[in-house]
Amino acid sequence: MDQKQIEEIVRSVMASMGQAAPAPSEAKCATTTCAAPVTSESCALDLGSAEAKAWIGVENPHRADVLTELRRSTVARVCTGRAGPRPRTQALLRFLADHSRSKDTVLKEVPEEWVKAQGLLEVRSEISDKNLYLTRPDMGRRLCAEAVEALKAQCVANPDVQVVISDGLSTDAITVNYEEILPPLMAGLKQAGLKVGTPFFVRYGRVKIEDQIGELLGAKVVILLVGERPGLGQSESLSCYAVYSPCMATTVEADRTCISNIHQGGTPPVEAAAVIVDLAKRMLEQKASGINMTR
């Protein structure tokens, strides 16, 4: 699927919702991740700010305009300069700050107040705390007994599409992107005439937990929105794992279709919602997902 097709899907879904299509993602990226390059070191600079990310550490460059253009074209750690064989102080401090931010989002919990504010039913896997979640991934693939009973009692049975939200390895990915991806996703699925299940939040969930959820609720397609393992300085990236007619005993990873890198610096959440709606429709038409789908 090329960019032109994606933009057409976005316009179609947003039009069916009665909303204007979002501006091209390039423009939004330019305003959120790019800033005027800075060349001087400063102890007062916020290491997580756009100014810090735009910092150029190469001293006395032969072609400063080339470095400026390169720095604006990527979020990679380029043009940071050297102090002999070592990185410069500001480059090292930013590296450490980004690493700390990534560790923080793995260890943080999604606040219960936030889940209640979104009106979501909350259930959990067999995991009871974050430490166990990180050390026993197998337990994160199964719902606890209380969760099974809650889903049976409070969720729509036999939906065409069941949407599930889980914290995964990034709390920020859920809390930052939720409002921009779930409402248009739910609206788009309903506009497509599909029977949509009750969305809910799974605490301490792993990807394979969607297999049990699909079996339990009799869903044809299960869509799991889960926080990705964060990279350096990128703690807000969300992934979508979609699977057709999942089964705990037989579904393997190749049966899933994944859309990753959903955030404002990657695939914008609103655009991702439109792509997921189109994906769910094709899964139902082809009765397949993952490598079994025809391109």
Swiss-Prot record:
Annotated pathway: Amine and polyamine degradation; ethanolamine degradation
Keyword Lyase part of the UniProt annotation: yes
The keyword Lyase appears for this protein: yes
Subcellular location per the Swiss-Prot or TrEMBL entry: Bacterial microcompartment
GO biological process, one term: ethanolamine catabolic process
EC numbers on record: 4.3.1.7
Family of this protein: Belongs to the EutC family.
GO cellular component: ethanolamine ammonia-lyase complex; ethanolamine degradation polyhedral organelle
Organism (species): Escherichia fergusonii (strain ATCC 35469 / DSM 13698 / CCUG 18766 / IAM 14443 / JCM 21226 / LMG 7866 / NBRC 102419 / NCTC 12128 / CDC 0568-73)
Cofactor: adenosylcob(III)alamin
Protein name listed in UniProt: Ethanolamine ammonia-lyase small subunit
Binding site for adenosylcob(III)alamin: V207, E228, C258
Catalytic reaction equation(s): ethanolamine = acetaldehyde + NH4(+)
Function comment: Catalyzes the deamination of various vicinal amino-alcohols to oxo compounds. Allows this organism to utilize ethanolamine as the sole source of nitrogen and carbon in the presence of external vitamin B12.
Gene Ontology MF terms: cobalamin binding; ethanolamine ammonia-lyase activity
Cofactor note as given: Binds between the large and small subunits.
Superkingdom to which the source organism belongs: Bacteria
Keywords of the record: Bacterial microcompartment, Cobalamin, Cobalt, Lyase
